[in-house]
Amino acid sequence: MAKRDYYEVLGVNRDATDEEIKKAYRKLAMKYHPDRNPDNPKAEEHFKEAKEAYEVLSDDQKRAAYDQYGHAGVDPSAAAGAGAGGFGNFADAFGDIFGDIFGGGGGGRRSNVYRGADLRYNMEISLEEAARGTETKIRIPVMAECETCHGSGARPGTQPVTCSTCGGHGQVRMQQGFFSVQQTCPKCHGSGKMVKDPCPTCHGGGRVKQHKTLSVKIPAGVDEGDRIRLSGEGEAGVNGGPPGDLYVVVHLKKHPIFERDGANLHCEMPISFTTAALGGEIEIPTLDGHAKMKVPPETQTGAVFRLRGKGIKPLRSNEHGDLFCHVIVETPVKLTERQKELLRELEDINQQDSGKHSPREKSWMTKVKDFFQ
């Protein structure tokens, strides 16, 4: 699995100060520390990930290498071309060992081309926008290819020279006992080249921080956490490598009336106690405007009415969900004397009829009576 961007891990911007980075790390360390989360392997993974990110971004030299080359600048195993699980190229590894023994020299020159980092953008949209789809513009900070030197890092009219330490391979051999092991060149950070006359715009990095504005189409039916991929809109690659992608993550704003549950919508429906007792027709809101609904007599609080097809049509579906209205019978307030008089009269009639008009209350009183006997 590819490593996450270190800035994303700590939840800070790429231009974050040392203090902001330290504060973000402390917060995550407190949250995911193994002592606070025993028997929780996920928390331990998050803790290690945050620690690794902090160790790089809190060191000026490592951070500069990471900003310029991504994970490959601080971790040799992250270089492009590594196989599954970080084992690298099998033939290259054994070529280095046996090449030294038998004179084969199987390493060869590497291009050290790295793909740009993927970026993440959190976008908040309304429930209506999620249901109908929308198009909006966003402005994001990225590491883009320097237009002055076209990514070479060298002043226009000049070219980078071959690294004298690794001879342009991007890696150096270290002798360990009988074996020769390859490591990323500490001088050129794996690029195989050195810039003698740096570009005045990017100062030799080949990339510059920029803000770019993009138009994002949000399809109808998206839900919380859905990701929209914009290919090639991430950070610029290194040494001519392909750019990364941008992932727009959808978050839904809290709606004043509706709560979403997949394709279905839920809302509370307050009705007067007279409508609840006698029945009637009420008007309720939907995403398509108002709709009329009949309330049957003797409706109680907690009753749920369903309006088919008044929910949301999810992505990759041809059917709309439903709208569920949850009844709340309102008790009248700020009564006039006349209203109080009528309610007392109603209560007297109810008592005279042995509570048959309030079956739940009668049943409850019977249970209470039996309890104390």
Curated annotation (Swiss-Prot):
Bias kind Basic and acidic residues: ranges: 354-373
Gene3D superfamilies reported in the protein's UniProt record: DnaJ domain, Heat shock protein DnaJ, cysteine-rich domain, Urease metallochaperone UreE, N-terminal domain
UniProt region (Disordered), positions on chain: 346-373
Residues at which Zn(2+) 2 binds: C163, C166, C185, C188
Cofactor(s), by name: Zn(2+)
GO cellular component, one term: cytoplasm
Localisation: Cytoplasm
Pfam families to which the protein is assigned, alphabetical: DnaJ, DnaJ_C, DnaJ_CXXCXGXG
Location, primary (coarse class): cytoplasm
Keywords: Chaperone, Cytoplasm, DNA replication, Metal-binding, Repeat, Stress response, Zinc, Zinc-finger
Cofactor note: Binds 2 Zn(2+) ions per monomer.
Chain positions recorded as Zn(2+) 1 binding sites: C146, C149, C199, C202
Database matches in SUPFAM superfamilies: Chaperone J-domain, DnaJ/Hsp40 cysteine-rich domain, HSP40/DnaJ peptide-binding domain
Physiological role: Participates actively in the response to hyperosmotic and heat shock by preventing the aggregation of stress-denatured proteins and by disaggregating proteins, also in an autonomous, DnaK-independent fashion. Unfolded proteins bind initially to DnaJ; upon interaction with the DnaJ-bound protein, DnaK hydrolyzes its bound ATP, resulting in the formation of a stable complex. GrpE releases ADP from DnaK; ATP binding to DnaK triggers the release of the substrate protein, thus completing the reaction cycle.
Record comment regarding domains: The J domain is necessary and sufficient to stimulate DnaK ATPase activity. Zinc center 1 plays an important role in the autonomous, DnaK-independent chaperone activity of DnaJ. Zinc center 2 is essential for interaction with DnaK and for DnaJ activity.
PANTHER family the UniProt entry points to: CHAPERONE PROTEIN DNAJ, DNAJ HOMOLOG 1, MITOCHONDRIAL-RELATED
The protein's name in its UniProt record: Chaperone protein DnaJ
Organism: Methylobacillus flagellatus (strain ATCC 51484 / DSM 6875 / VKM B-1610 / KT)
Primary gene name: dnaJ
